[in-house]
Structure formats: C-alpha cells, structure tokens
C-alpha cells in the first residue's frame, strides 16, 4: 500500500491539474460538431463484409441520414466518460487530502507543507527548523500512517460492499 501512497504523493499536483481540466471540460462541453462527425463518417471504412442492406447506394446520402444520431451518441459517450473520470479522480483526491489533513504531529505538518504548500525539502528544513534526514524520516512516517489509513478505508469499503 505504501507504493500507492508514494505514487499519490508524487502525482498529487498532476492529479489536481487533471481534475481542474476535466471540471472545465465538463462545464464547457460542446461535443463534436456536425461537420466533424460527417467528415469522420465520410472517411471511415466499414468493418467486416460489405453487404448492402438499404436502398441507399450513395454514401453521402447514407451519411446524411445517420450522422446526427451517431453524433449524439458519440457526444453522450464522451461526456459520460469525462464525468465518470472526474468523479473517480475527485473522490480519490478527496480521500487523499482528508487523510493527509488527519495526520497528527510533525509527520503531518511536513507532508502538508510538501503537498498543500508546495514547499521543497530545503524550504521545509528552513520552515520547520529540521534537518534533511528528519524531513526524510517524517515523510516516511507520514507515508506509513497514510498506508494504514488506506488499508482501513479499503477494508471498510469491502465490508460495506459485502454486507
């Protein structure tokens, strides 16, 4: 579990940016345009055997009849994907941030300085009046405590889902 926690610490700022980007994409969602959909359908090749099942033999006519339905489906699928990804990421960040905030003592203060204040190790040394080895020890202690919180959280989720 500590590998997962270390990965979250390492990727925290990137995850925050991705969550904000997804939030804005959802807020400003316009989907693909009619022209983009028609163009993609015009250049697509059918899969499998070619069997003509309608009286329409002209490809542009066929495209004109089905593009709107396909465009709505593509836009709906993409919007659902963005929303699902945002909700997953937001929940992961919510638990991670609350777990970090719940850490007590020097390990919690050091990790919060790293993550939420964006301080470097040198800045943490100066701000907390501690040496580099102490920063390292406090970080490891925070990771160990977070790993326990994640294990407990996971066990509670499993118990809830199985009940």
Tell what function each PLM region has.
Residues 102-119:
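Short amphipathic alpha helix immediately N-terminal
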Residues 118-134:
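Helix-turn-helix DNA-binding module
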């Amino acid at each position: 579990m500590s590998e997962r926690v270390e990965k979250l610490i390492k990727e925290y700022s990137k995850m925050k940016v991705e969550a904000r980007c997804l939030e804005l994409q959802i807020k400003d969602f316009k989907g693909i345009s009619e022209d983009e959909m028609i163009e993609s359908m015009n250049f697509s090749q059918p899969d499998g055997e070619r069997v003509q099942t309608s009286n329409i033999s002209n490809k542009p006519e066929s495209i004109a009849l089905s593009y709107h339905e396909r465009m709505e489906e593509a836009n709906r699928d993409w919007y659902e994907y963005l929303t699902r990804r945002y909700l997953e990421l937001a929940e992961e960040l919510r638990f991670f941030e609350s777990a970090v905030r719940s850490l007590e003592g020097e390990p919690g203060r050091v990790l919060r300085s790293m993550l939420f204040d964006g301080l470097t190790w040198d800045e943490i040394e100066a701000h907390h009046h501690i040496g580099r080895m102490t920063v390292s020890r406090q970080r490891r202690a925070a990771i160990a405590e977070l790993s326990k919180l994640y294990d407990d959280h996971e066990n509670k989720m499993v118990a809830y889902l199985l009940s």
